[in-house]
Amino acid sequence: IQQGTYNNKLYALGAMESSVGLYYNKDILAEAGVEVPDADHPWTWSEFTEVLKKVQPVVEKKKGYALDMTFPTGEATIYYYAPFFWSNGGDFVNKDGLKVNGVFNSKENLETVNYFKSFLDNGYMSKVQITDLFESGRAAFKFDGAWEVNTIYNNYPDVNLGVAPYVVSDNWDGGRYTPTGSWAFAASSKTKKLKGATKLVQWMSGVESGKRLWDESKSFPSTYEAFESSPIFEEDENYK
C-alpha cells in the first residue's frame, strides 16, 4: 500500500512480494563452526566480517569465496544493498525526494561503501562476477530474492539451503532493514478504455492473480489470502 501511495492517495497496488534475504550454505557454515542468529539478533557488520573470515578457508578448498556478491548495473544493486545504508543511518535523498547533496554523500554512506570495499580488500568476494557461485556450492553466502529458493530447489538440490536475517550496521538502532516491495500495476485516469484497464489492474493485484503468479513463477503473492492458500509458507523454513 505504502509504495503505491502519494499524498495520501493510492495510485498502484503491488502484484507480488519481492523480499531479499541472506542465503547461506548450511554445510559450509557447519564445517566452519558458524551458528546463524535469529531474526531479532542479526549479525552486525563486525560480526559478519568475523564470520566471513571463518568460512573463507572452507570455500577456498572449493575454489570459491565466502560471499557471492556483485554490484550489477540496474535496479538490483540499489534494491539489494540499500538496507546496509539505512541501518547505518544513511539515505540517498532527503525526505521530500528533491535533495541529494549532503545526503547521498554523507559520512554514514561513506562508511557503508568502505564496508563493502572491505569484502574485496580481504578477498571475501570476487572482483568479477562468477555465474552460479553460490548455487554450485562454492560460496557460503549470497544476498538474493525470494525466487532464489525455488531456483535452488529445482536446479541445485544438493545445496543445503538456509536463510538468515539481513546484516546490520554496528550502529544498528534495532529496526528492520530488508528489501521489500513489488512491481505494481496502475491505470491512467486519461486512458481511453478506463473500465477495461481498471478491471485488469484489479485482477493483476488481486488474490487469484497472486495464486497464479506463485504457481507459475514462484513469485510471492502480495495478499494474505493468496499466501494462506499454500501450506508451504508455514511448512518450509526457507519460505517462512
Name what the model sees in each region.
Residues A140-D144, G162:
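Paired acidic/hydrophobic, glycine-rich loop segments that form the ligand-binding mouth/hinge
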Residues T49-K54, G90, K95-K127:
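Glycine-centered hinge/linker elements that transmit conformational signals in sensory
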Residues S209-K211, E225-K240:
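Extracellular/periplasmic bilobal clamshell ligand-binding domains
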Residues F48, V55, L133-F141:
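Hydrophobic residues within well-ordered alpha-helices
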Residues I1-G21, S46, V51, E60-K63, ...:
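Hinge/lid segment of periplasmic solute-binding proteins
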Residues Q2-D38, M69-G97, P179-A187:
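Periplasmic solute-binding protein
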Residues A32, K107-L110, N114, D121-M125, ...:
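Extracytoplasmic/periplasmic substrate-recognition and gating elements
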Residues Y11-A12, Q56-T73, G206-S217:
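Bilobed periplasmic-binding protein-like "clamshell/Venus-flytrap" ligand-binding domains
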